[in-house]
């Protein structure tokens, strides 16, 4: 009798542990900090359908590299704030001659100060904009162990806006400009109290929610289209280890509260963050808005 009970129990336990292992691996891959790790040569076990911004195949490699080199040549001021959960966060401030406005740049997933926003930073600087390159938690020179897909980054963006406002003696208008996860964080931050000098938001290819983005990533990277159990496990690890729930990384409530104008734009062929995310954010937004796809 005992043997009959032990066998199915052992099978169920093995299945449970196997599923838990999958959930842990997914959490470790998408949420845990990978800064400083050396990539090992190994056989690919998943394929991405999108191309990196600086890949020669997309035609922007030269512009990308030139813009990044330009950023590295500029003299910038190191800036630091303490996040609401005690992390030391880093940014670089680039002043412009006769500045007319200040733009806070919020980079994307696993990005850093001089990544895919380098070209836009150069353009903004040449058009009389002071630029603050923030580095999100777990990226660049900022502290942190986990990427929270906007759940905590939204508060960091708010803190940076306050930091800039307190030092903005000329009361120049401030704009929040985010890309990908950075755009989602900017949109989420708009639901909180921001300085009066913040006059508008720019959201480049931002996602609408972490849960939706996880579904898209699972389908795109691993060809997994039905993952309710995996999402439950991921959320459990996020709560237990990283101190947030996936529902905390969602733009819906912020878009209902936001009163500042928002420019949404998205590449129609984006396969990393699908264009329907910007359309959803646009539809949720109750403030003055424009969508360009």
At which residue positions do the language-model features occur?
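Catalytic histidine neighborhood in serine/cysteine hydrolases
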Residues: 283-293
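Short beta-strand/loop motif that positions the catalytic acidic residue
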Residues: 257-259, 264-266, 270
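Conserved alpha/beta-hydrolase "acid-adjacent" motif
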Residues: 271-277
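The serine-hydrolase catalytic nucleophile loop
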Residues: 109-123, 136
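Conserved alpha/beta-hydrolase
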Residues: 123-143
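An N-terminal hydrophobic leader/cap segment in hydrolases
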Residues: 9-82
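Hydrolase active-site cap/lid region
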Residues: 188-245, 253
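Alpha/beta-hydrolase active-site loop
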Residues: 147-168
């Amino acid at each position: 009798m005992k043997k009959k009970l032990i066998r199915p129990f052992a099978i169920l336990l093995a299945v449970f542990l196997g599923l838990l292992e999958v959930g842990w691996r997914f959490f470790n891959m998408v949420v845990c900090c990978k800064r400083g790790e050396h990539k090992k040569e190994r056989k690919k076990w998943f394929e991405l359908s999108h191309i990196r911004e600086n890949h020669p195949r997309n035609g922007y490699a030269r512009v990308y590299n030139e813009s990044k080199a330009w950023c590295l040549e500029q003299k910038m001021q190191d800036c630091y704030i303490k996040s609401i959960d005690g992390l030391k966060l880093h940014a670089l401030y680039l002043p412009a001659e006769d500045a007319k406005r200040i733009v806070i740049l919020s980079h994307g997933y696993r990005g850093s100060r001089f990544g895919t926003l380098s070209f836009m930073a150069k353009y903004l600087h040449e058009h009389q904009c002071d630029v603050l390159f923030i580095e999100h938690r777990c990226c660049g020179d900022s502290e942190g162990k986990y990427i929270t897909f906007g759940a905590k980054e939204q508060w960091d963006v708010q803190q940076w806006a306050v930091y800039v406002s307190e030092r903005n003696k000329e009361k120049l208008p401030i704009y929040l400009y985010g890309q990908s996860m950075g755009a989602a964080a900017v949109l989420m931050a708009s639901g909180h109290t921001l300085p009066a000098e913040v006059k508008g938001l720019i959201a480049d290819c931002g996602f609408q929610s972490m849960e939706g983005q996880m579904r898209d990533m699972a389908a795109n990277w691993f060809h997994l289209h039905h993952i309710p159990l995996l999402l439950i496990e991921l959320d459990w690890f996020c709560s237990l280890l990283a101190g947030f729930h996936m529902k905390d990384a969602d733009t819906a409530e912020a878009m209902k509260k936001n009163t500042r104008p928002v420019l949404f734009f998205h590449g129609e062929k984006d396969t990393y963050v699908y264009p329907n995310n910007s359309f959803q954010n646009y539809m949720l937004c109750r403030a003055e808005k424009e969508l360009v796809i």
